[in-house]
Amino acid sequence: MCCISMAYIKRGFKEIIMNKTIIFDLDGTLTDSEEGILKSVTYALESFGYEIPPHETLLLFLGPPLVDSFQEHCGMALEEAEKVYKKFGERYGTIGKFENQLYPNIIDLLDKVKNEHYTVALATAKPEVYAREILDHFSITQYFDVIVGANYKEGLVYKKEILQKAIELCGNPLTDDTGCRLVYMVGDRKYDVESGNELGCISIGVTYGYGTETELNDANAEYLCDDVDDIVMTLDLEEMLVRR
């Protein structure tokens, strides 16, 4: 549970908020992108004659880099996985990225954090070009001060390094002079929580996305939120979610 010292409170709630950063994952946190991703994964696998895994296995493709998922769940070598990923992009880059929808009350959440002067960032393992197109599609790009996605040419592939870059670009401290942490990482998979914890963030795991409550607990999420309203309550400190 995050504690805020009385000295910190005395400086005023507005100042606290102005020093804070919130970093969101995209898939499974801001948007429900299951349809577009899984249809595009299926398209890619069928194009190369692979058997389609059961749905519960396909769900594991939501979150980590897809090249890794093709190797892990379909037994591909790296070179083959990269070819299949390219085929995935043929469909996802034109159709699949828009087979997607915002979760309920996301706009209200983004309004809140902008109005309360958080620095707002996106950190996603999705290629950054897709992430920006999706934010534009939903007319929410203006809420974000920083957007960082995967960029293979720059060596940005895994969540920890993507999150690290987002934190650096935000330019705010991780803690105040009392040691209270100032950066939230909000995501639905263990990769979000583990990366946030390793980098000194306050980790908020959302159970409405693609990771299970067990997965988020095992990753040591500091807070668990069952819906977007729970995120709002957590940020308001009106309802402190106990570490489970």
Regions found by a protein language model. Name each.
Residues 29, 36, 128, 191, ...:
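Conserved Rossmann-like nucleotide-cofactor binding loop
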Residues 81-85, 131, 159:
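Short amphipathic alpha-helix in the helical subdomain of ABC transporter nucleotide-binding domains
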Residues 19-108, 116:
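N-terminal helical cap/lid subdomain that shapes the substrate entry/recognition surface
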Residues 54-57, 66-69, 130, 162, ...:
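Hydrophobic alpha-helical segments typical of transmembrane helices
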Residues 2, 13, 18-20, 134-244:
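Asp-based, Mg2+/Mn2+-dependent phosphohydrolase catalytic module
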Residues 41, 109-135, 148:
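Substrate-recognition element of Asp-dependent hydrolases with the DxDx(T/V) motif
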